[in-house]
UniProtKB/Swiss-Prot annotation:
Protein name per Swiss-Prot or TrEMBL: Vacuolar membrane protease
Binding site for Zn(2+) 2: D198, E233, H331
Residues on Cytoplasmic side: 1-9, 427-436, 484-490, 543-715, 780-785
MF term (GO), any: metal ion binding
Composition-biased stretches (Low complexity): 577-594, 616-626
Length: 1040
């Protein structure tokens, strides 16, 4: 009966395939399908999934960007919903402007609602190349934004009473020292998407969090702030406005609920530290890895969420929980409830409630105390520690400290090589170090030929296979095993893995210590498993005989073979004289005779011959020892020199053989007078040690070597490989497969956004390599069926991928839309940005582009592979004003933007020029102000001062200011100042351009170019916004 886990092709193929399939199939299913939603509407007290879904359908009926009418409707609905929830739960609540009246009653309201129409923020934003219509060299940007956030404070059991957040509550005392937990989502969408997952699900999750914690019996230990912010989609404006709110200094921790995809599972995008992840770790269906968090930290992922503002500007500690796929629907009209699911909603909702409960329930010192960086202006929320985390099958969560992993990594780097060196020393002392041993000599017969061990076979084989996958591994490894079979192949593969893993671990350990990068945890686990597997390969050598004993056995087998061969030949030569039989025996190559095949006999017979034939030596000393039958030499094995003779008889014969050969000397021995005694050349061929090594196969009956591997390998335990594979395989397959699938899903459709196309392919290669790596020590034992099947799969899929069109109705290509108008001249352009190869066919389908020239140029705001293609848009003029034109197209935009710019000087300082610029635009909340010369100082009337948490005012000035009002048709007043010599009237050095944005496309006919695109573009294409405005109108101004 075959051992079911023996190291033979059948068991190896069966178990490796079974384990791979048993792990990969559920991983793929878990990656693609969110966990099932509960069948009941109220899965637990205080949560109603049906209600949440209804709210989602209500707020996603239309596009609702900040600069739209429906955005204001959504805000009113959310305020009404907040009031409805609080009334339904019987909670005592007030608006913040009613706190004084409530305080007279001597009772603190359980909930306070902040309808924030006051907070605004002015800040620096970094650099850009201007706008699409006003491209320039890189200039500094600034922004002024008026917030319309909704904040709901839920008082905790341990919170102070009253309106403790007011500045004059208790002077000189830290109020509500335990801090608050923020749950945040944004209720605006992009102008081309309905925002079901970005961020409608986050909004209704916040409403359910409010419902849960205001339900009787669910009051949190520490206070919770539920924030529904507005204006995230453009530059995270809502979170920036939070910085001006009176509750912000008391927020220690947060959960940001976001959407960067359009469904599926919600992943932990990133987190600040181990302690906040401990709050998430015990959710029912955790999903995420620290690799994603480190990818953000190292700049590999540039997508921004409110998390960036909360952490970098305010110093809060928290988690970014977000949807991440499919990117093809992200920011498009397919981000709607039709393409979302209750399962996705339940996944993010259940995780949010659990995490918030844990964060607000921490009443210790975890999130309070002095900051390690002692940063001014940031909340004092304790000392965070770096963590390592990842999920397993979306069901359990692994979380531990980075310092612990660093210690673990350092131990592996130092201890594991020393342990292997120690094992090697022990094996050497036991004479069982078969690794790196090619031959061995016996001490009993040092003059004998060295016996081949074959210990180097397989050492150089694995290194060349690092960069190829299953079939290539199998094909070359199996071929190498066929040509030069080696029982040490598995051990050397483990050794190579250990060496390469150790080198990688050096880099991983350095990153852990220097950069606090935890993403290398996979390599720490991998090297640990490789070390244990390698240790098994070394320890199993203890089952082998000593090399000297093996060599001695081979020598004895060699001697016995010669004498038993002589006896067999003697029995088969009845027609010859005894002298002839003796000569035949001597010619067969006994230890006492020369190799006739290599040196012919002399014609003159030496003493002790009969009729010119040699007399056979005595074999009595060996005749009683059973010997194996001679084995055929294996192809590829070299033939060694003969063992030197040691008997006096040999010396005599050697002397006689020194006679010079003549033309009568036979080719194969004997003499010229009686050469008929020879039968065949084969009977006189002298066998070498290399060939006779195979005769040692039966020196022990407890094991047979596999096929043509070294004869001593039969002693190796045939089951050891199975435990090595269990160490190397399952856990690494889980880590590599689920992490690779998750990250590939997150980035494989980002090429159309301008990201590098090489990144997804590199990621696929890297994780595929990690996925196959555990199989490499054993792959040469896999039968041909699996590799050949995978080769066929590769050929078929490669052919399909090369022939098939890359996009479809379910996985659409995203083109970026924008329309640009010079309101003074009426110039009108419609532009699409993307990969030119796909953008041109999209434009070709548009009726308004028919017969018009399409010009393409490199896009300054996207990647190097992205182009912007434009054509005359006069056939599709937008209706930008608030006046009802009775369906007629708007043909005059001159008065839609009004700019008044007047010059002034500071008293007593003629070297500084100042200007007051008033801007009014019809039917919009957003205009940008771009200067020809950067301004050295800038203020917005009625605005707050500069918020230095987002950066100091740049020394080289600001060239572009983004202006946002919370109301339509409101005038901006900007005071600008330039340093330098006085300028005269008529100089244009300090002039500029106003660019205003229109983003409301809910009413058909408002932006006909977009309506046309949604109707006529191919089914494989989607249209999304390029920048803040779907339509940008510009107007130049001069300072007078």
């Amino acid at each position: 009966m075959i051992n079911p886990i023996s190291f033979r092709p059948g068991p190896v193929t069966f178990w490796t395939t079974l384990i791979y399939l048993a792990l990969l199939i559920p991983i793929v299913i878990i990656n693609e399908e969110p966990p099932a939603a509960p069948k009941t509407a109220e899965p637990f007290k205080g949560v109603n999934l049906t209600e949440a879904w209804l709210d989602l359908t209500t707020i996603t009926r239309a596009y609702h960007p900040y600069n739209s009418k429906f955005n204001e409707e959504v805000r009113r609905y959310l305020l009404e919903k907040v009031e409805s929830i609080l009334e339904e739960n019987g909670a005592t609540w007030v608006f913040d402007d009613q706190m004084a009246a409530a305080a007279k009653d001597g009772k603190s309201a359980a909930v306070t609602v902040f309808d924030d129409n006051v907070s605004n923020s002015t800040f620096v934003m970094g650099k850009s190349n201007g706008t699409t219509f006003t491209r320039t060299e890189s200039i500094n940007n600034a922004a002024y934004f008026e917030g319309t956030n909704i904040l709901v404070y839920i008082r905790g059991k341990e919170d102070d009473d009253g309106d403790w957040w007011e500045a004059d509550y208790v002077h000189g005392m830290r109020r509500n020292a335990k801090g608050l937990t923020l749950v945040n989502a944004h209720y605006d969408s992009v102008s081309t998407g309905f925002g079901a997952t970005d961020d409608g699900m986050g909004v209704v999750t916040c409403l359910q969090v409010l419902k849960y914690f205001t339900t009787p019996g669910n009051q949190p230990q520490r206070g919770i702030v539920v924030m529904l912010n507005n204006g995230e989609e453009d530059w995270l404006y809502g979170a920036r406005a939070l910085g001006q709110h009176k509750l912000n200094p008391f927020i220690h921790t947060f959960l940001n609920v976001e959407g960067a995809g359009a469904g599926g599972r919600a992943i932990v995008f990133r987190a600040t530290d181990r302690e906040v992840m401990a709050a998430y770790a015990r959710t029912s269906h955790p999903f995420g890895t620290v690799i994603a968090s480190d990818a953000f930290g190292m700049g590999f992922i540039s997508s921004g969420t409110d998390y960036s503002v909360l952490v970098d500007a305010y110093g809060q500690r928290g988690i970014d929980l977000a949807f991440f796929k499919p990117r093809a629907r992200y920011h498009t009209n397919q981000d709607d409830t039709r393409h979302a699911s209750k399962e996705s909603l339940w996944h993010i909702l259940s995780a949010s409630i659990h995490t918030t409960k844990q964060l607000s329930g921490d009443t210790g010192n975890t999130f309070i105390g002095q900051r390690p960086d002692k940063a001014h202006g940031k909340v004092a929320n304790g000392r965070p520690s770096n963590g390592v985390w990842f999920d397993l099958f979306g069901k359990s969560f692994v979380l531990f400290g980075l310092r612990g992993m660093f210690a673990w990594s350092l131990t592996l780097l130092i201890a594991t090589p020393l342990i292997l060196v120690g094992i090697t020393w022990l094996l050497r002392n036991l004479d069982k170090d078969y690794f790196f041993t090619s031959t061995v000599k016996t001490k009993e017969h040092p003059e004998y030929e060295a016996v081949p061990i074959g210990g180097w076979k397989g050492f150089f084989r694995w290194a060349m296979m690092v960069s190829i996958f299953y079939f290539s591994f199998w094909m070359i490894m199996r071929g190498a095993n066929f040509v030069r079979p080696s029982a040490l192949h598995r051990g050397y593969a483990n050794l190579w893995l250990f060496v390469f893993g150790w080198i990688v671990l050096v880099a991983v350990t350095a990153l852990e210590d220097r950069r606090r990068i935890a993403a290398g945890y996979i390599f720490v686990f991998l090297e640990s498993a490789i070390f244990l597997s390698c240790l098994i390969s070394f320890v199993e050598l203890l089952a082998l005989p000593r090399k000297s004993a093996y060599a001695l056995q081979v020598q004895e087998d060699y001697d016995g073979h010669d004498h038993s061969g002589y006896q067999g030949y003697r029995d088969s030569t009845d027609g010859l004289s005894s002298g002839a039989r003796a000569e035949s025996s001597a010619s067969a190559g006994s230890p006492s005779s020369p190799t006739v095949a290599q040196e012919p006999s002399k014609p003159t017979a030496p003493a002790g011959t009969t009729n010119g034939l040699s007399t056979a030596p005595s074999v009595a000393a060996h005749s009683s020892q059973p010997q194996p039958a001679p084995a055929t030499p294996t192809p590829g094995r070299s033939t060694s020199a003969p063992i030197p003779s040691t008997t006096p008889r040999d010396e005599d014969e050697s002397e006689d053989d020194d006679d010079e050969a003549t033309e009568r000397t036979p080719l194969v021995g004997g003499n010229g007078t009686n050469d008929r005694g020879r039968t065949t050349f084969a009977t006189t061929y002298r066998r070498s040690i290399t060939a006779l090594v195979h005769g040692a196969r039966k020196m022990e009956e407890d094991g047979e070597p596999y096929e043509h591997e070294q004869d001593w390998s039969g002693h190796l335990p045939s089951w050891a490989w199975f435990f090595q594979f269990l160490l190397l395989g399952p856990f690494m397959i889980i880590l590599a497969a689920q992490t690779g699938l998750m990250l590939t899903d997150a980035v494989y459709q980002t090429g159309s956004d301008g990201s590098k196309l090489f990144t997804p392919y590199l990621m696929i290669f890297f994780f595929t390599l990690l996925l196959i790596l555990p199989l490499t020590p054993f792959i040469h034992r896999v039968t041909h069926h699996i590799p050949v099947f995978l080769l066929v799969v590769f050929i078929v899929t490669l052919t399909y991928n090369l022939i098939a069109f890359p996009f479809s109705a379910n996985n659409r290509y995203k083109a970026f839309f924008g329309q640009y108008i010079d309101v003074a001249t009426g110039e009108n352009k419609v532009c699409y940005t993307g990969i030119e190869e796909y953008v041109r066919p999209i434009i070709a389908e548009l009726p308004s582009a028919s017969g018009r020239d399409v010009t393409c140029g490199k896009s300054l705001r996207r990647g190097s592979t992205i182009a912007t293609c434009c054509f005359d848009g006069s056939a599709v003029p937008p209706k930008l004003g608030s006046e009802d034109l009775d369906g007629l197209p708007q043909d005059n935009y001159a008065d839609i933007i009004t700019v008044n710019a007047t010059r002034s000087h500071k008293k007593g300082d003629s070297s500084r020029t100042t200007a007051r610029i008033e801007i009014t635009a019809d039917n919009t909340k957003s205009c940008f102000l771009q200067f020809k010369k950067p301004v050295s100082a800038l203020t917005i009337e009625s605005g707050s001062g500069w918020d230095d948490r987002f950066g100091q005012y740049p020394e080289d000035g600001v060239g572009l200011v983004r202006l946002w009002h919370r109301e339509f048709d409101k005038t901006w007043v900007v005071n600008a100042e330039w340093k330098g010599s006085e300028t005269r009237k008529g100089d244009d050095e300090n002039d500029g351009t106003v660019i205003c944005m229109w983003s409301d496309a809910n009413t058909p006919g408002t932006i006909p170019a977009l309506d046309e695109a949604l109707q006529f573009v191919p089914s494989w294409a989607a249209v999304t916004k390029f920048s803040e405005g779907l339509v940008e109108g510009r107007k130049a101004f001069k300072i007078v």
